[in-house]
Amino acid sequence: MAGVGRTMIAPLLVLNLIMYLIVIGFASWNLNHYINGETNHPGVAGNGATFYFLVFAILAGVVGAASKLAGVHHVRSWGAHSLAAGAASALIAWAITALAFGLACKEIHIGGYRGWRLRVLEAFVIILAFTQLLYVAMLHGGLFSGNHAAGAGGYGGDYPADHHHKPAAAARV
């Protein structure tokens, strides 16, 4: 993971952003019909875990899409100063997506009729749980790669306040 660069992270960032937007669309449609009491609608139905799954799926979609904005900023600036925000928000998005993943698995395990939109939403959440984990691993691999912009305050980089981390003899100017 030491050689992970923006050429590898950027396509995964775009893929995850598109998938999170699709999750927002399907989750909001299903949740709207579920709240309206249209559980006999061919696209909704579900079981006891459906409501909880829909709530966490829409939450994962919104937080995931928002974390991709921090990721876009990091890929554009490619500095250590933006890496922390991008990695932290991606980790939070993955945690919420993992919760939605667990509820999707529970909903599939319980069984019963589920409409095609609900099954598509389950599939997207399951796929996103793994692609987001890969994205988080790639970002955290960037913490140790040292291939960020020079002078951006990264680990081991020379920046104006770097004298605090050197022996006293070397800190004198």
From Swiss-Prot:
Subcellular localization(s) per the UniProt record: Membrane
Summary of the function given for this chain in its UniProt record: May be involved in abiotic stress response through abscisic acid-dependent signaling.
Tissues with expression: Expressed in roots, leaf blades, leaf sheaths, stems, spikelets and embryos.
Induction: Induced by heat shock. Induced by drought, cold and salt stresses. Induced by abscisic acid (ABA).
Keywords: Membrane, Stress response, Transmembrane, Transmembrane helix
Name of the protein in its database record: Membrane protein PM19L
Regions that span the bilayer: 9-29, 43-63, 83-103, 124-144
Species of the source: Oryza sativa subsp. japonica
Domain of life: Eukaryota
Membrane topology: Multi-pass membrane protein
GO CC field: membrane
